[in-house]
Amino acid sequence: VFALAQKSSGADTATICYAVDADFAMEQNVSAFSFSDMTLKNIGIKKALPDTEEQALVFLFMASSQVTPEKYEELLDDFIAEYPNSADGYVRRATNRIYRSKDDASMDKVVADMDKALSVAQKKDDVYYNRAKLIYNYMLGNPEKPYKDWSYDKAVDEIRKAIAVQELPVYVQTEGDILFAKQDYAAALACYEKVNQSDIASAATFFSAAKTKELMKAPAEEVLALMDSCVVRFTEPYTEEAAPYLLERAQARMNANQARAAMLDYDAYYKAVNGKVNDVFYYYREQAALKAKQFQRALNDMEKAIELSPKDLTYRAELAVVNIRVGRNEEALKVLQDALAIDSKYAEAYRLMGIAQLQMKKKQEACQSFAKAKELGDPNVDGLIEKHCK
């Protein structure tokens, strides 16, 4: 056979015949990207794995997001049958199985796959690393009754076995993450600091160190220094990738009593996300503006927060506070009356009304407002009553 012929149709049937060279069929093969080939999908015939292990692994990666876990396991079984000495197949099957696991029997299969991966692996450290991550992610799911001896401590043991073979920064980063999860913050920080001296240092690794220091109650300036190292890894104009870190540094600057600098970060965040912010953002930026004595900006931000979340009484109370702060007591009373129209039992509104009325030299009305706040259970009004109404 050297070609497959097909009779022509139409006007050229008398003079033309079409044929496909036999070599064309011989050249057909399954590649790493064949899983997404619509022609092959439409045929409905089960696809073979690509001819090389490397291509087959890419094929599995492509398939993992397009098929059910059950179908994916069938592909993994095929891969393991074809490449029984590849640790990757066992590691991937263990990872797939753990998310479907419902009992100790199915977890036993996960462990068996990881043990087999270790026995065939050329790079033992890679398997220890993957086993540590598997246990760590399993524990993050807060299982009611963890499987056998699985724990954060066991995950630490596994990652340290990997580090003993080869101290890769990514292994040290994982050790830090596990130690952080088990709330051993001092040890986690030591890992993160080591990673931050390596070639994989990034905004994320400096952020991890900053959050760890924060939980250790370190001075605000030390936390801020790490957040500066985090943000400096981005260039202006900032994109959405930098946005979460700008938000975190804004809070770090607030904690370090740098309100004006915090406002700059909030403004940079706003630009980075193209103005797609919510009411909470405006509340936080208002807090920075208020602390920086930028009262008009504080008023504007609280009005915007209320516009986005009109039923949130906390925002109305905050707007009243800013108005009182700048002597706009009539405006504060109007804001608080609007809050009481939403919830007539909002005690804080009455307390703030009393404060505004005191500023307006209306002591009798203020004391009536304080009394109403106390009646509704405001815990902060007793001192005001004691000072002004007795």
Model-flagged regions — what are they?
Residues F2-A63:
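C-terminal cap/linker of serine protease catalytic domains
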Residues E82, V120, A164-V165, S198, ...:
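Structural marker of alpha-solenoid helical repeat scaffolds
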Residues S86, K124, L168-P169, S202, ...:
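Residue-level recognition of tetratricopeptide repeat
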Residues G89, V127, Y171-V172, T205, ...:
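TPR alpha-solenoid repeat register
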Residues R92, N130, T174, S208, ...:
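Canonical tetratricopeptide repeat
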Residues Y99, N137-Y138, A181, L215-M216, ...:
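Register position in tetratricopeptide repeats
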